[in-house]
C-alpha cells in the first residue's frame, strides 16, 4: 500500500480540495509519483474521467496537478443531489441508483469494499497518495459506517491533518471543538493541523497557533495566506458562486441564473478569465441584468425541477424580454433542454412531473430516457468551424426542426441546435469555452474582442503559483514525513 496522508476539514468549504490540488503539484515538483483520492464526494460538479466514468471535478483538477490521467478510482463514491431528500449514487464511475437519507447510511458499510479497492488501485505504483475528506469528522452522528472521513482513515490506517478556515471566523473554536468531540480512536489519527485562508500579517496569529496546540496537543504545520492563484482555479462548490459580486462594467455582461441544482458551473470559468467579460451569477429573487448581452442557462442535475424554479423566479419572462432586446442565449446540457418546446419524462426519471412545457425559444423537444451518456468528446463547432474538446453527462434525447442547425459536430453525429436568427443556441457539450479559438470567435460574434489567453495554460500556471505559496507557508517536509 502506498504512503498516504488525509486532509479533513473542520467543516465544508474550508478549502480542502484546492489545498490538496496544490500539495499534489508540490509533490510532483519534488519528483514524487503522487495521486489524489477522495473516498466520497457530494457534488453536481462532475467530470468524465480519462477512463470514462464520473468523478468530482475536484479530483479531475487534482489529477491534473499530479500530471496523471484521471480515474474513476480517485473518487469511488460520488453523490449527485437531485432532490431535497435524495441523490444519484455513482460508484466507481457508474450509476448505481438513488441514495436517500437513512437508506444511504445503511448502505455505506457495503461501499467500504469499493472504496478500499479503489484506494489500492490509486496507490499502485505511487510514492504518495493525498486523500481528501468530505464535510467534517465532527459530524459524529454520521460516524457509524462512515467512509468519507475517520471511518476511512481508521480502516486504511492513514494519518490525518485537520484544516481550519480562518476567513470565516472561529477557527480556534472549530479545531479545539473538533478535538473535544472526536472519539479517542479518531482523535489518535490526527497528527496536526493547518490554518487556511489567512489575510494580513500571519505573525498576529502566533498566539492562536499556540493556543490550539495547548488545548489539543496537535502540532501546527503552518498558516496558508489568502492566495490569489486560488481564484483562477475551478471551484467545486456552488457556495463560491453565491459570493460573487459585480465589479466594474465590462464590454460584455454574461448573466447566469443560479438554479437550485446547478451543475458543472466551471463551464463558465474561461469566460470569467476574459478581461472584457463579466459573468454575473443571478441569485433567486433577483432579476437578470437588463444590460446582459448573453444569458447562459447552465447544466443542472434536475432539469424539470430547475425549469419550475426558473419560472417561479420570473426568469422565463425576463429571458423573453432579453431576446426581444436583441440578446443572445446559450443553454448547456439541462439548460439546452429547457430552451425547447417541451420536456417529457414518462418514466418519472426526474420525479413526479411527467410532462412540462419548455421555454419555447428553440423548436425542439426532449424525451427523458434511463440511459445516461457519459463521455469525453472531440468535436467541431459548426458556428465557427473551430475544434472543441468537451464532455457529455446527461440523460434525455432531443429532437426537432432546429436540430437541423446544429451547434457542433461530434464524430458522425450532430449536437445541439441553433435558432434561425442564430441568437439562441443549445448544446449538450460541457467545457466548450475552454477551447481558446472557439471562445475568441464566439465572443467576437457578440461584439467583444476576446483576449489571447490560453485557458489551460492559465490553470497550469495557477497550480504552480499555488504550489509555490504552499511551499513558502507550510512545513512540507513535516507533512510528507507523516506518510
From Swiss-Prot:
The biological pathway it contributes to is: Cofactor biosynthesis; adenosylcobalamin biosynthesis
Its name, as the record gives it, is Cobyric acid synthase
Q: What does this protein do?
A: Catalyzes amidations at positions B, D, E, and G on adenosylcobyrinic A,C-diamide. NH(2) groups are provided by glutamine, and one molecule of ATP is hydrogenolyzed for each amidation.
Family annotation (NCBIfam families)? cobQ, PRK00784.1
Establish whether keyword Methyltransferase is in the entry: no
What the entry lists under Pfam families is as follows: CbiA, GATase_3
UniProt-annotated catalytic positions: 333 (nucleophile), 430
Any single GO molecular-function term of the entry would be: catalytic activity
For this protein, the parts annotated as crossing the membrane are none
Domain spans labelled GATase cobBQ-type: 251-438
Q: Does the keyword Isomerase apply?
A: no
A single Gene Ontology biological process assigned to it is:
cobalamin biosynthetic process
PROSITE patterns this protein is in? GATASE_COBBQ
Q: Which family does it belong to?
A: Belongs to the CobB/CobQ family. CobQ subfamily.
Which organism's genome codes for this protein? Brucella suis biovar 1 (strain 1330)
Which keywords accompany this UniProt record?
Answer: Cobalamin biosynthesis, Glutamine amidotransferase
Amino acid at each position: 500500500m502506498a504512503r498516504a496522508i488525509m486532509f479533513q476539514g473542520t467543516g465544508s468549504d474550508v478549502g480542502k480540495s484546492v489545498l490538496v490540488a496544490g500539495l499534489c503539484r508540490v509533490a510532483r515538483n519534488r519528483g514524487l509519483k503522487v495521486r489524489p483520492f477522495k473516498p466520497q464526494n457530494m457534488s453536481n460538479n462532475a467530470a468524465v474521467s480519462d477512463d470514462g466514468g464520473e468523478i468530482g471535478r475536484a479530483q479531475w483538477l487534482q489529477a491534473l496537478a499530479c500530471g496523471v490521467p484521471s480515474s474513476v478510482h480517485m473518487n469511488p463514491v460520488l453523490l449527485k443531489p437531485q432532490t431535497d431528500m435524495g441523490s444519484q449514487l455513482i460508484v466507481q464511475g457508474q450509476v448505481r441508483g438513488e441514495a436517500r437519507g437513512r437508506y444511504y447510511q445503511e448502505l455505506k458499510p457495503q461501499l467500504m469494499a469499493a472504496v478500499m479497492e479503489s484506494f489500492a488501485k490509486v496507490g499502485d505504483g505511487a510514492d504518495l497518495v493525498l486523500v481528501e475528506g468530505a464535510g467534517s469528522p465532527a459530524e459524529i452522528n454520521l460516524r457509524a459506517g462512515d467512509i468519507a472521513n475517520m471511518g476511512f482513515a481508521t480502516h486504511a490506517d492513514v494519518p490525518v491533518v485537520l484544516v481550519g478556515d480562518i476567513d470565516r471566523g472561529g477557527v480556534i473554536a472549530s479545531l479545539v471543538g473538533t478535538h473535544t468531540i472526536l472519539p479517542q480512536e479518531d482523535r489518535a489519527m490526527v497528527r496536526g493541523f493547518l490554518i487556511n485562508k489567512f489575510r494580513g500579517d500571519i505573525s498576529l496569529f502566533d498566539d492562536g497557533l499556540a493556543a490550539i496546540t495547548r488545548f489539543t496537543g496537535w502540532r501546527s504545520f503552518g498558516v496558508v495566506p489568502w492566495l490569489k492563484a486560488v481564484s483562477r482555479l475551478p471551484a467545486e462548490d456552488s457556495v463560491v458562486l453565491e459570493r460573487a459580486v459585480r465589479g466594474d462594467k465590462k464590454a460584455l455582461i454574461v448573466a447566469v441564473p443560479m438554479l437550485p441544482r446547478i451543475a458543472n458551473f466551471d463551464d463558465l470559468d474561461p469566460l470569467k478569465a476574459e478581461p472584457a467579460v463579466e459573468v454575473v451569477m443571478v441569485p433567486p429573487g433577483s432579476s437578470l441584468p437588463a444590460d446582459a448581452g448573453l444569458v447562459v442557462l447552465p447544466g443542472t442535475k434536475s432539469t424539470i425541477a430547475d425549469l419550475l424554479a426558473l419560472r417561479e423566479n420570473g426568469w422565463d419572462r425576463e429571458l423573453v424580454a432579453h431576446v426581444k432586446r436583441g440578446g443572445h442565449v446559450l443553454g448547456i446540457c439541462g439548460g439546452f433542454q429547457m430552451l425547447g418546446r417541451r420536456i417529457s419524462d414518462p418514466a418519472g426519471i426526474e420525479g413526479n412531473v411527467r410532462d412540462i412545457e419548455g421555454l419555447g425559444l428553440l423548436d425542439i423537444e426532449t424525451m427523458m430516457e434511463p440511459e445516461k451518456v457519459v463521455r469525453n468528446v472531440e468535436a467541431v463547432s459548426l458556428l465557427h468551424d473551430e475544434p472543441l474538446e468537451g464532455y457529455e453527462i446527461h440523460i434525455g434525447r432531443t429532437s426537432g426542426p432546429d436540430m437541423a442547425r446544429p451547434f457542433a459536430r461530434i464524430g458522425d453525429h450532430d449536437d445541439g441546435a441553433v435558432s434561425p436568427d442564430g441568437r439562441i443556441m443549445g448544446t449538450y457539450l460541457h467545457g466548450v469555452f475552454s477551447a481558446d479559438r472557439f471562445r475568441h470567435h464566439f465572443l467576437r460574434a457578440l461584439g467583444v474582442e476576446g483576449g489571447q489567453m490560453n485557458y489551460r495554460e492559465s490553470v497550469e500556471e495557477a497550480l504552480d503559483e499555488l504550489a509555490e505559496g504552499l511551499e513558502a507557508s507550510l512545513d512540507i517536509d513535516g507533512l510528507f514525513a507523516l506518510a
